[in-house]
Amino acid sequence: MSRQMGDGHRLFLQNMMTNGIVSAAQAGMLHKKCCELHGGQEKIDDFINVVNTHLQPLFMHIRKGMSEEDGQEHFVLMDLIVESDSGSASSTAILNSADKLISKKLKKKEAELVLNKFVQDKWLKEQDGEYTLSVRCIVEMEPYMRTIYQDMIKVCYVCHNIALQCQVCENPSCEIKVHLPCVARYFRARSDPHCPACNDFWPHEIPEMQAAQSQSSQNLPSSSKENTAPTQTRRSRRV
């Protein structure tokens, strides 16, 4: 059975989730503080391995990397859900991965408890068995996601925020992404929707925003608007 996370590990992870990336020196000071406050004499690599063992079923990992500019080492919290084409991970896939840990196996019940804790703390959002990054997570981790995943991250063509759950233009030479709420607003008055970038026909389901949600979203910061839930009730048609 894998070693349980203590309060010191949780404090370290909380700081990593807040900052996204820290230098090796900062990580060393944080590790020392966590050990002093909550006890423990582990070396930092062993300490982080305990955290990673519990993060792996959640498609997250603290990884060490070196700066190409000055050669200094940094610790980065990698969120592997970003690598998913759908921007989500199913509960089945997450819990099944608990049996495939590289180091020690994690019981599915333990993985489920950790997963529920992430949802409770509003780092992840669950709906119908699918887990996605919450608004809090996206907003707080956006700077490092743009830096670390710069070749992978795409932004919404309409609002220019990170686009994980979205519709994609099917033109291979275009492939822009648009959030579902942005799709609803952009195509609201268009009976024959076309891609705002390449002008190809937009074949996807066009969501319709609920009136109250659409009105309230006008008062939200741009980074929060993407959480407004659309309802898909109208399909775009060719004329």
From Swiss-Prot:
Pfam families: SMC_Nse1 (PF07574), zf-RING-like (PF08746)
ZnF (RING-type) residues: 156-199
GO terms for cellular component: chromosome, telomeric region; nucleus; Smc5-Smc6 complex
Annotated region (Disordered), positions in chain: 212-239
Annotated EC: 2.3.2.27
Low complexity: bias regions: 212-224
Subcellular location: Nucleus; Chromosome, Telomere
Matching InterPro entries: Nse1, Nse1_RING_C4HC3-type, WH-like_DNA-bd_sf, Znf_RING/FYVE/PHD
GO biological process: DNA damage response; double-strand break repair via homologous recombination
Origin: domain of life: Eukaryota
Record field: catalytic activity: S-ubiquitinyl-[E2 ubiquitin-conjugating enzyme]-L-cysteine + [acceptor protein]-L-lysine = [E2 ubiquitin-conjugating enzyme]-L-cysteine + N(6)-ubiquitinyl-[acceptor protein]-L-lysine
GO molecular function per UniProt: protein dimerization activity; ubiquitin protein ligase activity; ubiquitin-protein transferase activity; zinc ion binding
Keywords assigned by UniProt, alphabetized: Chromosome, DNA damage, DNA recombination, DNA repair, Metal-binding, Nucleus, Telomere, Transferase, Ubl conjugation pathway, Zinc, Zinc-finger
Family membership noted in the UniProt record: Belongs to the NSE1 family.
Record's subunit section: Component of the SMC5-SMC6 complex.
Function: RING-type zinc finger-containing E3 ubiquitin ligase that assembles with melanoma antigen protein (MAGE) to catalyze the direct transfer of ubiquitin from E2 ubiquitin-conjugating enzyme to a specific substrate. Within MAGE-RING ubiquitin ligase complex, MAGE stimulates and specifies ubiquitin ligase activity likely through recruitment and/or stabilization of the E2 ubiquitin-conjugating enzyme at the E3:substrate complex. Involved in maintenance of genome integrity, DNA damage response and DNA repair.
This protein's name: Non-structural maintenance of chromosomes element 1 homolog
Source organism: Danio rerio (Zebrafish)
